[in-house]
Amino acid sequence: MKHKGLEIKIKRAIILLFATAVLPLQAQPPADEILERIDRNLSSENRVFESSMTIHGRRNSRTITSKTYAVGDKRSFTEYLSPPREEGTKMLKLEEQLWIYSPSTDRTIQISGHMLRQSVMGSDLSYEDMMDDRKLTETYNAEVVGTEEIGGRDCWILQLTGKVDDLAYASRRLWVDRERYVPLKEELFAKSGKLLKRSEMSDVVQIEGRWFPRTVFYKDMLKQGSEGTGFRITDIRFNTDIPEYLFSKAALKQ
């Protein structure tokens, strides 16, 4: 009888150990579901936001402020507010086309082809980065490849592989907050596997029921003389009314 009681205890201990071992696996949702949750936080039908972009060089830094109106991932209108040198510069995105108006020359130019890879006002962001605002679920396949702690937050590490051809980055690696479903770190890679850019997200706040990082620090790994670019959203409103007239070339000169 004693042996039988001991066997039961051992079996219970094994079952408990097994259940504890598989618990983390059960708590991890599929990679596609994680991407969907990220999209729900970061994407919206439309949004209006004010931001500051601080470009850090080896000798000095400069800050540019702007206001952006965006509808989905196809249309956006940005007006730069300061400093005086950039004030009045406007950027219009319609589908796959991008125009920039310069008040100093009173000219509107279209940015296309290889020009899209150029830096935006000397920052670590390219025009391609500003153009592509599609949902991650529409453009990448995902796989959970590990876990790591970032800034005291438990994260899943997601490996993203492009599933459409027209991507600036063939693959990405995301460190996703396991509780809030927002990326806290990201690495962007070329088709060759070379690391092109790295970004870190912080100041995550809840806005209108969604978690959103208000600050992103970008680093172009190939850009010489750059100490990185900080992008901070100072005010944002989701799903608000936006005047239709903004999304026309005529609005650039108004």
Question: Where do the PLM segments sit?
Answer:
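Extended lipid/amphipathic-ligand handling interfaces
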Residues: 38, 66-70, 201-206
